[in-house]
């Protein structure tokens, strides 16, 4: 396939996806066109490192330097293309209208769906100063014919993939995936053309949902102590209790701001059974002490301790010296920790611990690095779910929230996305129940996020969603 043939093939597919050319070479032929087509595929361009073709913003000129995002392909040869680099590029004039788009995490997530072992992505798509060094190193090592052109544009390629044309059909399919993603970003086309874009993107392999229970059980086997973290509604406590069904004995404790060492481990409390007028105290066995005693007395049993909302308490005050017992590999350490009448180097081998942590509650205690090292951390993500016959999962509403978080949430803010439990309602009254849940549970939650300074760029999208689905204004 020649470079010109590759260009024409990609252009034809772009028109199927809704591209309407505004120009033909330097002449404007359709002022309402949604893209400017650039093409430099003559022989000298392959010598001086300037061979490419691109679909750029319709607001740019047919020639000269340009701004903003573009779909670009750099072929390696004029007469026989052996490989090419397909890119989301930025014009050498930088950003003019696309900076806001570049700043949204959703754009990078959109293109990351195209990831292969030959694709390269900058951490920030706003960055047009640093070099795409991994791409450049790969080109220098294995694709010398493309070295000059990639060297010329090495700072303005936020997303790229090296495509080999050894298998022409496979190569074109990969290129069309990138083209469809760019078309989706630019919102090209009629309803029918958007369906063509969607059909192309549906060919992408879908990530498999993790088997949370299986993965957590594996962690318990290897690490013993696991924290389940996630946003409200992701099923942290439910999952812990589900896993608990496989244990012989389960102990459960929910932490709160006033939880202390004597509550969790061991202490004293007033003895109210005495008739004497003199105040007397008796031993107060905390749940950890009781768990240890039981484990020592029942060495053949599997014991699980569940600590719900572990970061609601001041962990230094709650754990004290027993902090050192939560060590899944004690090594040669022989220091004993005293817990009332017990002296331990570590927790008994038949005890495992699951703690839960709400990542959305920003008022909670910070978990220090020493505790993080002692526990394995497993994140429960929101996901679609199958429910019983009398209930229904409100997939449409769930996806509307998921789309907003995908588009606007930073990596940290993704931990705030409401979980699937919010979207499970009774089948008999599903619409009314979902509306009430949005008004009285989800709207206050989102307003709290916004008040704390999170997801501010998504504010208008949330306002529109709540107004559309409930008829209620988020802000009067």
Q: Where do the PLM segments sit?
A:
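Long, solvent-exposed, polar/charged low-complexity segments
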Residues: 1-17, 132-200
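A short, conserved, highly charged catalytic patch centered on acidic carboxylates
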Residues: 20, 46-51, 91-94
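Histidine-centered divalent-metal-coordination microenvironment in nucleic-acid enzymes
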Residues: 68-74, 83-87, 421
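Residue-level detector of short, conserved catalytic/binding motifs and their immediate flanks
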Residues: 51, 67-70, 84, 224-226, ...
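Acidic-basic catalytic patches of nuclease active cores, encompassing PD-(D/E)XK
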Residues: 2-44
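Compact, glycine/acidic-enriched structural inserts
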Residues: 78-141
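C-terminal regulatory/interaction module of P-loop NTP-utilizing enzymes
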Residues: 184-476
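Amphipathic, interaction-prone secondary-structure segments
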Residues: 32-76
């Amino acid at each position: 396939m020649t470079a010109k043939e590759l260009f024409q093939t990609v252009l034809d597919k772009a028109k199927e996806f809704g591209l309407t050319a505004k120009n033909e070479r330097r002449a404007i032929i359709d002022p309402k066109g949604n893209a400017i087509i650039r093409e430099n595929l003559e022989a000298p361009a392959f010598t001086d490192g300037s061979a490419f073709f691109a679909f750029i913003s319709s607001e740019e000129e047919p020639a000269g330097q340009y701004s903003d995002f573009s779909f670009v392909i750099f072929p390696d040869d004029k007469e026989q293309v052996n490989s090419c680099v397909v890119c989301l590029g930025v014009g050498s004039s930088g950003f003019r209208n696309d900076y806001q788009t570049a700043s949204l995490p959703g754009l990078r997530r959109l293109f990351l769906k195209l990831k292969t072992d030959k694709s390269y992505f900058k951490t920030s798509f706003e960055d047009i100063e640093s070099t795409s060094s991994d791409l450049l190193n790969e080109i220098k090592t294995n694709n010398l014919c493309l070295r000059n052109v990639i060297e010329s544009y090495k700072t303005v390629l936020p997303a790229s993939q090296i495509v080999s044309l050894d298998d022409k059909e496979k190569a074109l399919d990969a290129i069309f995936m990138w083209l469809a993603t760019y078309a989706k970003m630019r919102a090209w086309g009629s309803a029918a053309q958007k369906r063509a874009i969607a059909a192309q993107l549906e060919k992408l392999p879908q990530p498999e949902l993790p088997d949370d229970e299986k993965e957590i059980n594996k962690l318990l086997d290897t690490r013993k102590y696991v924290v389940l973290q996630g946003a409200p509604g992701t099923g942290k406590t439910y999952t812990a209790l589900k896993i608990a069904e496989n244990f012989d004995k389960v102990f459960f404790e929910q932490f709160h701001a006033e939880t202390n060492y004597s509550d969790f481990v061991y202490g004293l409390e007033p003895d109210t059974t005495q008739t004497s007028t003199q105040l007397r105290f008796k031993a107060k066995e905390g749940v950890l002490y009781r768990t240890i005693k039981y484990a020592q007395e029942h060495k053949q049993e599997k014991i699980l301790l569940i600590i719900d909302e572990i970061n609601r308490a001041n962990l230094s005050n709650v754990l004290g010296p027993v902090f050192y017992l939560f060590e899944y590999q004690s090594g040669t350490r022989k220091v004993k920790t005293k817990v009332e009448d017990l002296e331990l180097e570590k927790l008994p081998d038949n005890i495992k611990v699951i703690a839960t942590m709400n990542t959305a509650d920003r008022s909670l205690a910070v978990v220090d690095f020493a505790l993080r090292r002692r526990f394995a951390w497993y994140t429960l993500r929101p996901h679609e779910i199958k429910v019983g016959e009398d209930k229904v999962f409100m997939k449409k509403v769930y996806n509307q929230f998921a789309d907003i978080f995908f588009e606007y949430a930073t990596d940290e803010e993704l931990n705030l996305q409401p979980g699937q439990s919010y979207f499970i309602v009774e089948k008999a009254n599903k619409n009314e129940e979902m509306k009430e849940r949005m008004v009285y549970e989800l709207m206050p939650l989102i307003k709290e996020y916004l008040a704390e300074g999170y997801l501010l760029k998504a504010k208008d999208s949330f306002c529109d969603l709540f107004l559309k689905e409930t008829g209620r204004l988020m802000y009067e």
